[in-house]
Amino acid sequence: MASTSTASATAMAGAFAAAGVNKPRGSAACPRVPAGGRQRLSCVVRCDAGPGVPAQMAAMAASVAALEQFKISADRYMKEKSSIAVIGLSIHTAPVEMREKLAVAEELWPRAVAELTNLNHIEKAAVLSPCNRMEIYVVALSWNRGIREIVDWMSMKSGIPAVELREHLFMFRDSDATRHLFEVSSGLDSLVLGEGQILAQVKQVVRSGQNSGGLGKNIDRMFKDAITAGKRVRSETNISCGAVSVSSAAVELALMKLPKSECLSARMLLIGAGKMGRLVAKHLAAKGCKKVVIVNRSVERVDAIREEMQGIEIVYRSLTEMYEAAADADVVFTSTSSESPLFTKEHAEALPPVSGALGGVRLFVDISVPRNVSACVSDVGHARVYNVDDLKEVVEANKEDRLRKAMEAQTIISEELKRFEAWRDSMETVPTIKKLRSYADRVRASELDKCLQKIGEDALTKKMRRSIEQLSTGIVNRLLHGPLQHLRCDGTDNRTLDETLENMHALNRMFGLDTEKAVMEQKIKTKVEKQKTQN
């Protein structure tokens, strides 16, 4: 974490102007904003050899040129510290028509992470893409360039022009990005305040990232701390008590649209038996529904639901029987991962009308993203479609009490945020500590070797040699103890981060460690080698 520069506010304005996205909440400038306006520099080095130069000489020249390029790149990026950033959209900023084009299925998260980390200025990445949001968390080598690359990637993936996309994106950086994730994990940013399913989805990001290796230590730690924050908020504030979920809100909405006298007699069809579908069945049972027909690819998940819910009749239908089952249903819930609509206007027109006691209208309640039911189905006279964006009217009724609990939750989030920032700050000085110890150990080993040569190997017993080595190590450790104490940044003393960083820079100058440049050179070198391997 770098100290705030005088150019921070200007650089932040430049970053938003360049990326064309909304400013982070909270402050006009964030603490790690780099000075903008540097020339764009490609990390890919080309070195053309003349026709008479052997291939090995050309390769050697390319290698030397690449090393020089690393140094130039490192110099230019020195003031652009690696930043944690999140860029995305949610139900609060974008309609479902846009969110579904950007949605990334869970099994495709690793591929998306691989594509993102292949971008020139993205070091590590994570994707969180449940039904109500699509968020990309990254460690960016360059703030301005990295954000532009992500927006372009999102535009390419979705087919939405970048200009249109920017109108709906939000972006947070460093501590603002961390706070946002902690709020998401705690259910404070959900459509349904305090809902619990988002915490499971945050956990899945960690599991997916551990398998793909794309998270890196900063994002991995941030997500794990977000899980801790989410658990604490739910256990210490009871924000989830009485809270509805997306699935229960879908059931409530369907029952609101049915005549009260016919709610329990309406024929219910559920398409999809995943996590969301299972919760729909559970809430239907809790409302007194006696029978639910479930269409699913395999019978095993339906059997599991049947075993869990003994008080309701569960009938299984295969996917080939879906339209036949829909013809016999008054209310159709859809919750699948299908990339294309299951019901179009033509499908709805082919279905027979429902009972006049139910108003003659078949209800489609679609909680899938991408949507399983085309919006044009509502153009059919005897059909109405509701999607996740229509759940807001149900949610508002239960919101006031949980808003009070959300204020309590912010105290917990601030505590966890402080703990994470202290850890991240402590990581800032680790390279300097390592290089200083390595430098001191090289000096110790060199001087020890000179001493032993003067004494003569034959004049020393093993015990005497070991004692001399321990003496040299002890002297070095005692000498380093004071300086290293002044590099501690874990919140256990009264030293500010700026003071700690000043100490770090002083040690770098005094001992010629050049740590920051070496770290950046290594990052750029890793990027170039990765690109060469893929090409």
From Swiss-Prot:
For this chain, the family text in UniProt reads: Belongs to the glutamyl-tRNA reductase family.
Task: Read off the HAMAP family from this record.
Answer: Glu_tRNA_reductase (MF_00087)
Domain of life (superkingdom): Eukaryota
Spell out the note in the miscellaneous section: During catalysis, the active site Cys acts as a nucleophile attacking the alpha-carbonyl group of tRNA-bound glutamate with the formation of a thioester intermediate between enzyme and glutamate, and the concomitant release of tRNA(Glu). The thioester intermediate is finally reduced by direct hydride transfer from NADPH, to form the product GSA.
The compartments listed are:
Plastid, Chloroplast
Q: Which residues bind NADP(+)?
A: G272, A273, G274, K275, M276, G277
Task: Enumerate the UniProt keywords alphabetically.
Answer: Chlorophyll biosynthesis, Chloroplast, NADP, Oxidoreductase, Plastid, Porphyrin biosynthesis, Transit peptide
Q: Which biological process annotations from GO are given for this protein?
A: chlorophyll biosynthetic process; protoporphyrinogen IX biosynthetic process
| Listed name of the protein | Glutamyl-tRNA reductase 3, chloroplastic
Q: Where is the active site?
A: C131
| CC per GO annotation | chloroplast
Q: In which tissues is it expressed?
A: Primarily expressed in roots.
PROSITE patterns cross-referenced by the UniProt entry: GLUTR
Where, in this chain's numbering, is substrate bound? C131, N132, R133, S190, E195, G196, Q197, Q201
Q: Which GO terms describe its molecular function?
A: glutamyl-tRNA reductase activity; NADP binding
Q: In which pathway does it act?
A: Porphyrin-containing compound metabolism; protoporphyrin-IX biosynthesis; 5-aminolevulinate from L-glutamyl-tRNA(Glu): step 1/2
Mind telling me which InterPro entries this protein's record contains?
A: 4pyrrol_synth_GluRdtase (IPR000343), 4pyrrol_synth_GluRdtase_dimer (IPR015896), 4pyrrol_synth_GluRdtase_N (IPR015895), GluRdtase_CS (IPR018214), GluRdtase_dimer_dom_sf (IPR036453), GluRdtase_N_sf (IPR036343), NAD(P)-bd_dom_sf (IPR036291), Shikm_DH/Glu-tRNA_Rdtase (IPR006151)
Q: Which SUPFAM superfamilies match?
A: Glutamyl tRNA-reductase catalytic, N-terminal domain, Glutamyl tRNA-reductase dimerization domain, NAD(P)-binding Rossmann-fold domains
Pinpoint the site Important for activity: H180
* Catalysed conversion reaction: (S)-4-amino-5-oxopentanoate + tRNA(Glu) + NADP(+) = L-glutamyl-tRNA(Glu) + NADPH + H(+)
Reported EC number(s) for this entry are 1.2.1.70
Q: What does this protein do?
A: Catalyzes the NADPH-dependent reduction of glutamyl-tRNA(Glu) to glutamate 1-semialdehyde (GSA).
